[in-house]
Amino acid sequence: MTTTTRRKFGIAGALVGAASAGVAAAAMAKRYAVGRIRLRPDLEASEPFGELRGREHTLITSDGVALHVEVDGPEGDGGAPLTVVLCHGYCLSSESWHYQRRDLREQHRLVLWDQRSHGRSQRAVTGDTSIDRLGDDLAEVLETFVPGPCVLVGHSMGGMTIMALADRHPELFGDRVRGVALLATSAGKLAEVTLGLPALVSKAVHKVAPTTVSMLGRRGSLVDRTRHAGSDIAFLLTRYMGFGDSKNVSPTLVDFAESMIRATPTEVVADFYPALMNHDKLSALHVLDPVPTAIMVGDKDWLTPPDHSRAMAEALPKAQFTEVPDTSHLIQLERPGAVTDALRDLIKRVSV
């Protein structure tokens, strides 16, 4: 090997070494940052996240998918006359209603369910993953587990599920469905959401996102095996994107939210992504007009921005609209008191 060749290899080795050192330093910096966050006082450290349970059931849908359903709260002849049905969002599970279950279960009959391919429900391997199918799933949950009047509560994709129910089963609203709460959700045009990025960057992201998500979905098993290695980054992203007051949010709560997201297989993320981007139910909102409706959104929600909730409120002028300050997308976890109080108020407004 000539002196020149050795010099070239030496330079290349130095560059690779420097790059590796840079990556390692960045990883250590992230780990250090997360470590410091976890050392802060944590008021939620003893909260039993993921431990609350009701009476567990399995519902086989008309297309053969097993849904996990839990019924909580009063039962029997002396039970509550009204059922509150909680519909969770994309990449979450029924556990995301932890605080609402904890605070409402003594007085109200609750039905919580994991949407297909989420939580403890079966993966819809060959089944439909459209928003319309989620609306049909909800109709089957109501038929099986809700014998009387109910209030529907939906967060994010769960709100879209309720809109699909209204579009496909409008006859249920007014008689069976007596009230609706739509939290941090959208009636459509999610492909135009900027995610807080500059317009040109956002446009570029949306242009490549469908192909990228589809590609990751095809390699889902491989991606899932590497997700744990990026847990510090996932923690920081969840903290930043999910919570408006991210500097003061409980690390235990962030871990809980991130664990639900991480438990959602990459293939499921890819399966549902096109349905979310194509979701358009603004024309179905009129079905909700006869029933008391509450619309809530955080003012720092970048995933389903406040403008989307305002558009729904304009379509439902009788709805009670609330924009919660210093709050992002995981509103029921970040501001549980405000959300639970709004649900109690909605229940009071519902005639049984």
Q: Model-found features: residue ranges?
A:
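Conserved HGGG/HGGXW glycine-rich cap/lid loop of the alpha/beta-hydrolase fold
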Residues: 65-123, 141
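Acidic catalytic loop of the alpha/beta-hydrolase fold
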Residues: 276, 299-304
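Flexible "cap/lid" loop of the alpha/beta hydrolase fold
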Residues: 171, 175-222
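Catalytic active-site module of serine/aspartate enzymes centered on a nucleophile-bearing elbow/loop
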Residues: 310, 314-352
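Conserved alpha/beta-hydrolase catalytic His-Asp/Glu region
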Residues: 217-287
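Hydrophobic alpha-helical topogenic segments used for membrane insertion/localization
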Residues: 5-34
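Short beta-strand/loop motif that positions the catalytic acidic residue
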Residues: 288-289, 295-297, 301
